[in-house]
């Protein structure tokens, strides 16, 4: 801290009114902190040194009105150089400048400018002119400020264009991301549906297998309707014949039962006195007489009245 104060005091020793002369001091960098401590120095001469750049915090010296940077090796001014709002006189003679920062357009107080003997770009060199006298240096300041305002406008347009492109690119990326996420959702949904379908098919197959197993068990226990339908023509003909015989047997049995009932009625009830029963009893007796010759049947057909 004492060392910094010492350097500041050394600079104050070089202060003459509001002018601070640091020319021919073999400086390779600007002592910005020491200069900030001397706001009274509104005119700063840094000519004939070994400066190649100016630090960014040099732009904090907004109190400077007159600045001489001639005959150095400066290749580029700080990007925020336009913050030196009070700067009116700027000498950049014999440096290595090719261009000026866009913020240079903000030096609205600038009245005098010398850019001679710099490797300026053609457009800027044409605007700057020769600056051979006071009048030309004043005109140089006006033309360069106007030119830099145009550059600033183009820069802002380009910046807006880049921002718009970035915005559109971001939108496209977001849209692409949404499409990707939607595809992933559809894929997950389709995969889930496929799993569900596979489970359903497995379940149906299992149910079908169980039904087939139950059907086989039932087929082993008793003939199914399918087996019946698959009977051979010979079996069908035999079944039809048996059916007819059963029907005939039923008819005969029914007729025999009717005859038996009539005989019983005529033999053992009061109806035996009527003419029909008389005939029935006569036929019955004749039949018994014909069958008495058979000893086996005689026992069953014996006249109950004789017992």
From Swiss-Prot:
Classification via InterPro entries: Leu-rich_rpt, Leu-rich_rpt_typical-subtyp, LRR-SigEffector_domain, LRR_dom_sf
Main location: membrane
Keywords in alphabetical order: Coiled coil, Endoplasmic reticulum, Leucine-rich repeat, Membrane, Microsome, Nucleus, Repeat, Signal-anchor, Transmembrane, Transmembrane helix
Coiled-coil residue windows: 156-222
Cytoplasmic compartment spans: 1-247
UniProt xrefs under Gene3D superfamilies: Ribonuclease Inhibitor (3.80.10.10)
Bilayer disposition of the protein: Single-pass type II membrane protein
Ranges for region Disordered: 170-238
Residues in the Lumenal compartment per record: 269-307
Start-end of Basic and acidic residues biased regions: 174-187, 194-238
LRR repeats: 10-31, 40-61, 63-84, 86-107, 109-131
Location(s), subcellular: Microsome membrane; Endoplasmic reticulum membrane; Nucleus envelope
Domain of life: Eukaryota
Pfam assignment, any one: LRR_8
GO cellular component, one term: nuclear envelope
Spans through the membrane: 248-268
SMART domains in the record: LRR_TYP
Subunit structure comment from the entry: Interacts with SGO1.
PANTHER family, alphabetized: LEUCINE-RICH REPEAT-CONTAINING, LEUCINE-RICH REPEAT-CONTAINING PROTEIN 59
Primary role: Required for nuclear import of FGF1.
Full protein name: Leucine-rich repeat-containing protein 59
Organism in which the protein naturally occurs: Xenopus laevis (African clawed frog)
């Amino acid at each position: 801290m004492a060392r910094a104060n010492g350097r500041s005091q050394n600079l104050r020793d070089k202060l003459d009114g509001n002018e601070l002369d640091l020319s021919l001091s073999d400086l390779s960098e600007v002592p910005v902190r020491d200069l900030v401590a001397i706001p009274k120095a509104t005119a700063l001469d840094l000519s004939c040194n070994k400066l190649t750049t100016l630090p960014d915090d040099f732009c904090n010296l907004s109190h400077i009105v007159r600045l001489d940077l001639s005959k150095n090796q400066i290749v580029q001014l700080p990007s925020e150089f336009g913050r030196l709002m009070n700067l009116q006189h700027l000498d950049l003679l014999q440096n290595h400048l090719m261009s000026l920062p866009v913020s240079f357009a903000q030096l609205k107080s600038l009245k005098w400018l010398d850019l001679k003997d710099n490797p300026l770009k053609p457009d800027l060199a044409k605007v700057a002119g020769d600056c051979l006298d006071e009048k030309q240096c004043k005109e140089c300041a006006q033309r360069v400020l106007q030119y830099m305002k145009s550059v600033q406008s183009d820069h802002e347009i380009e910046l807006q264009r880049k921002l718009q492109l970035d915005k559109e690119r971001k939108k496209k990326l977001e849209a692409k991301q949404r499409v990707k996420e939607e595809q992933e959702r559809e894929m997950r949904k389709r995969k889930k549906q496929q799993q569900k379908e596979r489970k359903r098919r497995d379940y149906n197959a299992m149910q079908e297998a169980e039904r087939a197993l139950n059907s086989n068990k039932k087929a082993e226990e008793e003939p199914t309707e399918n087996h019946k339908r698959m009977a051979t023509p010979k079996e069908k003909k035999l079944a039809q014949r048996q059916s007819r015989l059963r029907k005939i047997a039923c008819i005969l049995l029914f007729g025999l039962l009717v005859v038996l009932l009539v005989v019983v009625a005529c033999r053992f009830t009061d109806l035996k006195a009527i003419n029909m029963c008389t005939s029935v009893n006569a036929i019955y007796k004749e039949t018994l007489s014909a069958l008495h010759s058979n000893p086996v049947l005689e026992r069953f057909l014996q006249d109950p009245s004789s017992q």
